[in-house]
């Protein structure tokens, strides 16, 4: 019988993580469970840094960005002896179950713990929206608002100077954030990890835009595809138009979560407790067509793929 659970946030922070923690804690307390908050993700689990939470521990945090429990990247957690110490730390506090909030790297940690006999449930928290098994991840919509606001501001100055602006957006290997922001921000050109890209083809498209009378342009590009500073110099040389690159960076992770992220995080936090009390373990939470679902973590990591939104890309190209 489950009496105590732990909750942690891991990897890159995302707006709405606090709301998810709150959802876990208050749902668990309503089911007569005790909840330990674990500081700084898997690192804190290994270092035995935990605190017993009550309903007041999560008061007034639903509107706060970041994660009050802290987060960290801890690659040593992939070592079995490190995980054994983490499990021992939880067992010493009579913790029966662990809820992990984070991205696919955090999912791997939860999967490894479950395989070692310590049951876990994972909640998707990442602005990249790159986790399989869910339409949206916690933090994505807030980051999207941040990116679009930045694009709007860049457009003001780009139009004033008849400049080409390149804006680099987070997302790793997933272009969802870039694509959505490009549509909402009216970007003229989009470069995504899912679509083959050459700088020559991009310049050709930009020149075609100039021939049509475009005085300025915004190019939205997902991080890690290329060096955007070098790309800006290349475009400027080939088009004879002033070109500047802006890397939005970690500002995309900050700020108060928007309404949808607060609701999504609250629902996922509640649902995680619901399914662990039903006896499920080694599962990850998702939302499909606004309905809460759960999948096997291993299946989500190895077999499930996020479908690329080709219809959204078509929309974006039609509106260039």
UniProtKB/Swiss-Prot annotation:
Cofactor: Mg(2+)
Activity regulation behaviour: Allosterically activated by ADP and other diphosphonucleosides, and allosterically inhibited by phosphoenolpyruvate.
GO MF annotation, one: identical protein binding
Active site: 128 (proton acceptor)
PROSITE patterns in alphabetical order: PHOSPHOFRUCTOKINASE
Entry keyword Nucleotide-binding: yes
Pathway: Carbohydrate degradation; glycolysis; D-glyceraldehyde 3-phosphate and glycerone phosphate from D-glucose: step 3/4
Catalytic reaction equation(s): beta-D-fructose 6-phosphate + ATP = beta-D-fructose 1,6-bisphosphate + ADP + H(+)
Annotated Mg(2+) binding sites: 104
Enzyme's top EC category: transferase
Enzyme Commission number(s) from the entry: 2.7.1.11
Keywords: Allosteric enzyme, ATP-binding, Cytoplasm, Glycolysis, Kinase, Magnesium, Metal-binding, Nucleotide-binding, Transferase
Residues annotated as binding ATP: 12, 73-74, 103-106
Residues holding ADP: 22-26, 55-60, 155, 186-188, 212, 214-216
Domain of life: Bacteria
Subcellular location field: Cytoplasm
Pfam family, one: PFK
Residues bound to substrate: 126-128, 163, 170-172, 223, 244, 250-253
InterPro entries, per the entry: ATP_PFK, ATP_PFK_prok-type, PFKA_ATP_prok, Phosphofructokinase_CS, Phosphofructokinase_dom, PKF_sf
The keyword Transcription appears for this protein: no
Alphabetical list of HAMAP family matching this protein: Phosphofructokinase_I_B1 (MF_00339)
Annotated function: Catalyzes the phosphorylation of D-fructose 6-phosphate to fructose 1,6-bisphosphate by ATP, the first committing step of glycolysis.
Subunit relationships: Homotetramer.
Family indicated by similarity: Belongs to the phosphofructokinase type A (PFKA) family. ATP-dependent PFK group I subfamily. Prokaryotic clade 'B1' sub-subfamily.
The protein's name in its UniProt record: ATP-dependent 6-phosphofructokinase
Name of the encoding gene: pfkA
